[in-house]
Swiss-Prot record:
This is Cytochrome b-c1 complex subunit 2, mitochondrial. It is found in: Mitochondrion inner membrane. One of its GO terms (molecular function) is metal ion binding. It comes from the Eukaryota. InterPro entries: Metalloenz_LuxS/M16 (IPR011249), MPP/UQCRC_Complex (IPR050361), Pept_M16_N (IPR011765), Peptidase_M16_C (IPR007863). It comes from Schizosaccharomyces pombe (strain 972 / ATCC 24843) (Fission yeast). Keywords: Electron transport, Membrane, Mitochondrion, Mitochondrion inner membrane, Respiratory chain, Transit peptide, Transport. Component of the ubiquinol-cytochrome c oxidoreductase (cytochrome b-c1 complex, complex III, CIII), a multisubunit enzyme composed of 3 respiratory subunits cytochrome b, cytochrome c1 and Rieske protein, 2 core protein subunits, and additional low-molecular weight protein subunits. The complex exists as an obligatory dimer and forms supercomplexes (SCs) in the inner mitochondrial membrane with cytochrome c oxidase (complex IV, CIV).
């Protein structure tokens, strides 16, 4: 290993411009725009709206607003939108996250203008029809909410956010079973969310100048308005326990201020996912799982970034609750060990893994939650933030770990609660 490290420079090539993340940001007709050109025949156009569950006035409103996308507008029926896009070979999709609603069109680059006009039309001229709420939007949202509630791990992570942040980022993303927002609530929220200062347009694939010009042409009619506001995120903690007969989970959550390069590197150092197929990996959490339970349970770390906060999570899962309890204790011990005396090689490896994972999020033609959040953030999407990975040191990692451990973590236990631990038992 030492000889490999010494000879590593032989394998390195000169660093090139990071085209995968190099979006060109600008303001066009009051709209925030960012674009990159790629040597592909297809591209995408996304509208990233700051209207996720963090900003909603009542539970479920953001989810229903997202489901109204690509329904009837002032110019086209929902059927016409569907048929026209199918004839052009396009794909229309929507996502909702804790901070954003993302409307995306993927298409052959030659049809860029059609989709730029369609997305602007959806934002500016959606008709919120009562019958569509009753017959299409509500049923679709309820099905998606049911699927969410059937996924025990997703429910556990939602509970972890609730305990770590309480309100705002901690709000429930999907429509609660008992909620039924009115059409007037949705229309009122849309009128405040669909304004120029509250969304960004992201182009990936087509000619950047052409995409920018079309954005200026079609999005210019949208009202200016003021961005939606949310109270600053408050970091909290707590424990939640849910009985379940299925797979057991124990989730640890360490809330922190806005994501830093150190937090991304820390997440990679903890790891848990194997970098080589059919292996357990050599990260701290992989070793913890092997030591504590001979891999009868697994432990995986992940960092979820938001605009003014982030959540470092460690998820321990398996069928044996005793193995999970032992692995949770060993994983917590592994995290505490990083508060001092971290070997340089561990940090170098963590930096490389963190950069690979972070930059890979920008490679797909369509946006995901991480790339969307970073692109609309002036700090996390910049070259300065990316170069910050190379400045991470053992001392800076230790400082972050000490800060995370200064207050109790949030925990969620799902499964056999007679065996799964409490935080103070780790």
């Amino acid at each position: 290993m030492k000889s490999f490290t010494r000879n590593l420079r032989r394998f390195q090539t000169p660093r090139r411009n990071l085209h995968g993340i190099s979006y060109t940001p600008k303001k066009v007709e009051g709209v925030s725009f960012a674009g990159r050109e790629t040597p592909t025949a297809t591209g995408s156009l996304s509208v990233v709206i700051n209207a996720g569950s963090r900003y909603q006035p009542d539970a479920g409103v953001s989810h229903l607003l997202e489901k109204f996308a690509f329904k009837t507008t002032e110019e086209r029926s929902a059927l016409r939108i569907t048929r026209e896009s199918e004839l052009l070979g396009g794909q229309l999709s929507t996502q909702i996250t804790r901070e954003h609603i993302i409307l995306t069109a993927r298409f052959l680059n030659e049809y860029l203008e059609y989709y730029a006009r369609l997305l602007a039309e959806v934002v500016d001229a959606t008709k919120f029809l009562p019958f569509q709420l009753t017959e299409e939007v509500l049923p679709t949202a309820r099905i998606e909410s049911e699927l969410f509630r059937e996924d025990i791990l997703r429910v556990a992570m939602a509970k972890l956010h609730e305990k770590a942040f309480h309100r705002g980022i901690g709000n429930e993303v999907y429509l609660p079973a008992s909620a039924s927002p009115s059409i007037s609530e949705i229309k009122d929220f849309a009128s405040k969310a669909y304004v120029k200062s509250n969304f960004s347009v992201i182009s990936s694939g087509p000619d950047v100048q052409k995409a920018s010009d079309l954005c200026a042409k079609y999005f210019a009619v949208i009202p200016d308005g003021s961005p939606l506001k949310s109270a600053p995120t408050k970091i909290s903690s707590g424990e939640s326990r849910v009985y379940s007969k299925g797979t057991n989970y124990f989730c640890l959550g360490f809330p922190a201020p806005a994501a830093s390069p150190e937090l991304f590197v820390l997440s990679s150092i903890l790891g848990g996912d194997a970098a080589v197929k059919w292996s357990h990996g050599n990260t701290l959490l992989a070793k913890a799982a092997g030591t504590a339970s001979e891999y009868k349970a697994t432990a995986v770390a992940d960092l979820t970034p938001y605009s003014d906060a982030s959540l470092l999570s460690v998820v321990i899962s398996g069928s044996c609750p005793k193995a999970i309890k032992a692995t949770a204790s060993e994983s917590f011990k592994a995290l505490k060990s990083l508060s001092s005396n971290i070997p340089n090689d561990v940090v170098k490896s963590g930096i490389a893994m963190a950069k690979t994972k972070y930059l890979s999020a920008f490679e797909p033609v369509t946006l995901n939650a991480i790339s969307a959040s970073s692109l609309v953030s002036a700090s996390k999407g910049s070259d300065a933030f990316i170069s910050g990975f190379d400045k991470v040191t053992p001392a800076s990692i230790s400082k972050v770990v000490s800060s995370l451990l200064a207050k109790p973590a949030s925990t969620v236990a799902v499964g056999n609660l007679d065996v799964l631990p409490y935080y103070d038992e780790l």
